[in-house]
A protein has these predicted regions:
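Short secondary-structure capping/junction motifs at helix and strand boundaries
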Residues: 1, 21-25
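Positively charged, Gly/Ser-enriched RNA/tRNA-binding surfaces
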Residues: 2, 6-12, 17, 35-184
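EAL-type cyclic di-GMP phosphodiesterase domain
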Residues: 24-33, 176
Length: 184
């Protein structure tokens, strides 16, 4: 399952709850923990950051009822038009991936019945520039290799190690020694 959200949805939904005491970025960081903490714990964290209890509850309610931005809705529609099944895509209005450098779409790959994600990423238009490079919009993702292998083993998707035949050629007499070592 691919969970999707975008910064526009997060910022537009949660900005009304920010103040001089608590930034929208800080609210987003707390909301992003909804997959790990209870709603009561997230509300308590928001209150500890300076958001009044009623506003913290309202922020949580607002994000749970948020709709995708027009940009994200277009991305979801494009994915469907490319043959991605509707059951594979899930809008998650609380998904933020905990990083402020995302500027557009955000996504995480999850395996149904398993906790955590096996990968994630998104759009980050200013990241390369912030690291001293040119101003280049970018999209990227990271795959949790260990997590992916763990899930594949749990689900019996990895076959036992098998030997295979390999042809190793010697391109030059001077490479005969190293080539024979590789062949072993």
């Amino acid at each position: 399952v691919i969970e999707l959200n975008d910064r526009e949805t997060l910022i537009n939904t949660l900005s009304p709850f920010s103040s001089s005491e608590i930034s929208v970025a800080s609210i987003i960081q707390s909301i992003d923990k909804l997959d790990k903490l209870s709603e009561a714990d997230v509300i308590q964290e928001l209150v500890s950051k300076g958001l009044p209890n009623d506003k913290a509850s309202d922020a949580l309610s607002a994000i749970k009822n948020a709709k995708p931005s027009s940009n994200l809705a277009e991305i979801i529609e494009s994915a469907k038009n490319l043959g991605v099944s509707e059951s594979t895509l899930r809008f998650n209005p609380a998904l933020a991936r905990g990083l402020d450098y995302y500027t557009g779409m955000i996504f995480e790959g999850k395996i149904p019945g398993e906790s955590g994600s096996v990968g994630g990423g998104g759009r980050y238009d200013r990241l390369i520039e912030s690291l001293g490079g040119p101003s280049i919009p970018a999209v990227g993702f990271g795959l949790g290799f260990d997590r992916t292998v763990e899930v594949m083993q749990t689900k019996g998707l990895l076959s036992a190690t098998q030997s295979t035949q390999v042809l190793v050629t010697i391109f030059s007499p001077s490479l005969q020694g190293p080539t024979l070592k590789v062949a072993q």
